[in-house]
Amino acid sequence: MTTLTDLTLAEARDALLNKDFSAVELVKAQLAEIEQARALNAFIKETPEKALAMAEASDARIARGEAGPLEGVPLGIKDLYCTEGVETTAASHILEGFKPAYESTVSANLWRDGAVMLGKLNLDEFAMGSSNETSYFGPVVSPWRRKGSDARIVPGGSSGGSAAAVAARLCFGATATDTGGSIRQPAAFTGTVGIKPTYGRCSRWGIVAFASSLDQAGPIARTVRDAAILMRSMAGHDPKDTTSVDAPVPDYEATLSRGVKGMKIGIPKEYRIEGVPAEIDALWGQGVEWLKDAGATIVDISLPHTRYALPAYYIVAPAEASSNLARYDGVRYGLRVPGKDIVGMYEATRAAGFGKEVRRRIMIGAYVLSAGYYDAYYVRAQKIRTLIKQDFDRAYADGVDAILTPATPSAAFGFGEKGSGDPVEMYLNDVFTVTVNMAGLPGLAVPAGVSAEGLPLGLQLIGRPFDEETLFALASVIEKAAPKIAPPPKWWA
């Protein structure tokens, strides 16, 4: 028998409108799952009272025939999104106890459409990480385990709490953010669907900034349809965000039945990199066959500046982070550590408040922006960024509708397995995803298979600017063709 929490978001939405059960019943079922799953550490802050109050309001609207598109659907919110009156920490000690007096635009859009907030989800501190091991509140544990092993594995990052919560059936969907792969990589690691929309499609207002020219909000969900439903509510123009684009938001769910026959799909040769496991290459080849079978045409393409994307990203992103994080000084909000004078207070607060990875990136950013190195590093990285964007522009000008690549260079790994001695080892997790952020394009990760160890593997689709519809249509084809991945056994219950 299917329990309420095993329903997809689309099924739950339709059943609520059909009055098969109430929003309060659904929220209570979800809260019980969350209580059982504390070992995953997916939530930083649970909000059961708020969730039940919102569910009661949803039931009243449904009874009056005033239901919104997400009426009564329980969601998790990445703790990078400001939520009015609810603690927002960015998983950092420096923001512990901070309660915003305002709501982020994206979460406000979700509440406008009737969604219910279950709580705030864990993440890498200030979204800086690829494994969710850098959170001040402890790492998130993936609900997945390798075959025959009880060893904990990472859910990916930085949106590890979002991905783990969705995969473990703790919520029907979750908000996330993606600066270099932080939606797509954890989605691939946990067998969920994650989309990073085109830069400007979703408002950044009220989301704690990491790298402002790269950050973008997006959803993580169990199915392509669920992600499409969430995207429609999250997206939209916001005059409070100067990078928000004033363009109509399509009905993404309606595009899922759109055929892909005649579409031209590019396969970039530069994504065939040394050291990638054979099972990743095999999955990529299988994805090609699925799209061929659906009537798409496959063409080889070249994105020649791909090899420079990762080093350029790790100059641009820390540079912007060092600027954005300068505002945390202990004066107005969050942690304050006393010092002998005002400068001493600044220094003591920032030293105690920021974790190791955040401090590392602030120092890298300050270095590349310094007078003697600005031209040698930052300016050159921005020039490379332009060349990366031009590579994609040429591919799309030649008639390519979308690009298919692996989502990650491996399946999920264990705690402490990567980056403990050399941080670059961890940064290489973003090798297939950072180009998309550097070019401001939409990218979607869809589950496509499992590794030899029984862990989820994903494929990535990269689209033209503001053409998320094509990505959803293609992802729907892959989702239907791929073997169904059973949810992870509830070892934590």
Curated annotation (Swiss-Prot):
Q: Which residues form a coiled coil?
A: none
Q: What highest taxon heads this organism's lineage? A: Bacteria
Enzyme Commission no: 6.3.5.7
List, in alphabetical order, the GO biological process terms annotated in this UniProt record.
Answer: translation
Q: Kindly give the InterPro entries that the UniProt entry links to this protein.
A: Amidase (IPR000120), Amidase_CS (IPR020556), Amidase_dom (IPR023631), AS_sf (IPR036928), GatA (IPR004412)
**Keyword presence, Lipoprotein:** no
Reaction(s) catalysed by this chain, per the record, are:
L-glutamyl-tRNA(Gln) + L-glutamine + ATP + H2O = L-glutaminyl-tRNA(Gln) + L-glutamate + ADP + phosphate + H(+)
List the active-site residues: K78 (charge relay system), S158 (charge relay system), S182 (acyl-ester intermediate)
GO MF, one term, reads: ATP binding
| Enzyme class, broadest EC rank | ligase
Give an example GO cellular component term for this record.
glutamyl-tRNA(Gln) amidotransferase complex
Which terms are listed as keywords in the entry? ATP-binding, Ligase, Nucleotide-binding, Protein biosynthesis
Subunit and partners: Heterotrimer of A, B and C subunits.
As for family, the record states: Belongs to the amidase family. GatA subfamily.
Q: What does this protein do?
A: Allows the formation of correctly charged Gln-tRNA(Gln) through the transamidation of misacylated Glu-tRNA(Gln) in organisms which lack glutaminyl-tRNA synthetase. The reaction takes place in the presence of glutamine and ATP through an activated gamma-phospho-Glu-tRNA(Gln).
Q: What is this protein called?
A: Glutamyl-tRNA(Gln) amidotransferase subunit A
